């Protein structure tokens, strides 16, 4: 359960609840991974000019072309192949040039480099060490080439991660907010809202995370040091 006595938060929720009671819209709608791929919601999000992305696991974004090609050739599922091809084009054409704020746990970066575990389109992949290295280096290159692409790292400790529940991943663009709880079953973990006040509320929450004392911005060179 979550609660807040902060006046700013309660007033914001009061406005949302009042509007919802007047018209029976859902604040958050369940979305299956299959529907997300079919309706291009994830592709639209990565194509957005403004993105706020908080991953609680390895970042499923901006993989270099060579790695994407290997993943495409490594699956026999035609619909997933087509999804990966579209995702590759979106990364090439839009995501690398967009205004992106990306937040990751420091331990998540380290774990990804050690284990190579990556979920892409809700499909688990076991990445090779060279693929992980290429991915991290490409993210660093995007940081260098796009001044509007910024990476923030939450300096977490093993004690913090064990004593507190892992928050869901949050993806915010200009049109929607998507929440992914990777601790739940794959067919239960996506919820989406296109409700403007929900998008604004989560955007404010995201921006608040960036102000936390344990949240620091990383340069491209600092990211490469994880390797």
Where are these regions (language model features)?
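Basic, Lys/Arg-rich alpha-helical nucleic-acid-recognition elements, primarily the DNA-binding modules
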Residues: 1-13
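Charged phosphate-binding loop/patch that engages nucleotide di/tri-phosphates or the phosphate backbone
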Residues: 216-227
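Hydrophobic protein-protein interaction segments
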Residues: 24-218
């Amino acid at each position: 359960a979550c609660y807040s006595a902060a006046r700013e938060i309660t007033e914001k929720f009061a406005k949302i609840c009042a509007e919802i009671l007047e018209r029976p819209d859902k604040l958050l709608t369940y979305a299956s991974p299959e529907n997300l791929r079919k309706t291009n919601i994830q592709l639209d999000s990565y194509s957005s000019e403004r993105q706020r992305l908080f991953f609680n696991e390895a970042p499923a974004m901006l993989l270099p072309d060579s790695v994407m090609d290997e993943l495409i050739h490594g699956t026999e599922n035609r619909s997933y192949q087509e999804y990966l091809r579209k995702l590759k084009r979106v990364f090439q054409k839009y995501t690398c040039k967009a205004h992106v704020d990306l937040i990751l746990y420091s331990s998540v970066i380290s774990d990804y480099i050690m284990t190579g575990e990556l979920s892409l389109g809700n499909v688990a992949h076991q990445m090779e060490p060279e693929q992980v290295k290429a991915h991290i280096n490409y993210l660093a290159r995007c940081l260098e080439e796009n001044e509007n692409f910024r990476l923030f790292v939450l300096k977490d400790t093993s004690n913090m991660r064990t004593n507190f529940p892992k928050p869901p991943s949050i993806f915010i663009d200009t049109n929607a907010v998507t929440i992914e709880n990777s601790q739940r079953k794959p067919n239960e973990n996506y919820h989406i809202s296109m409700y403007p006040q929900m998008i604004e509320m989560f955007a404010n929450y995201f921006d608040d995370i960036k102000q936390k004392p344990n949240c620091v911005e990383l340069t491209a060179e600092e990211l490469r040091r994880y390797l």
